[in-house]
Regions:
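Soluble FAD-dependent oxygen oxidases
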Residues: 1-121
Length: 121
């Protein structure tokens, strides 16, 4: 599952950070379910901010199970006026899912610093 949203005329910085907080508050639940979320918060032109998920990887789960797991998050976002367009896919194998979700990429640069974090339960 992949999606993105950002600040705009209808999404204030305050609303954006409330949405990020709603995601962060659910880390223990998503971690316990064995999910892997590859995401970033980015600063754009002016004071624009964006959040991108590329992808939300849920090994050993069906798409229906992942949608059920994330339903409350997407409801909270909808209540905040955020309805990201979600790209979904389901795969028969770990390798197939990994290959579809994690393209090779250049990481980091002069204005970007990439880091990984492990959040304990």
């Amino acid at each position: 599952m992949s999606f993105a949203f950002g600040t705009s005329e209808t999404i204030s910085h305050e609303t954006f950070w409330k949405a990020i907080r709603a995601f962060w508050e659910r880390f223990p639940t998503f971690n316990k379910a064995g999910n892997y979320e590859y995401w970033g918060v980015f600063h754009g032109e002016g004071d624009a901010l964006s959040f991108a998920m590329f992808p939300w990887f849920a090994p050993n789960h069906t798409l229906a199970e992942l949608k059920n797991l994330t339903a409350s998050l997407f409801k909270d976002w909808k209540d905040l006026g955020i309805e990201p367009e979600v790209t979904e896919s389901e795969h028969d194998s770990f390798l197939g899912a990994w290959s579809a979700g994690f393209a090779r990429e250049a990481v980091g640069g002069a204005s970007t610093k990439t880091a990984g974090r492990l959040f304990p339960r």
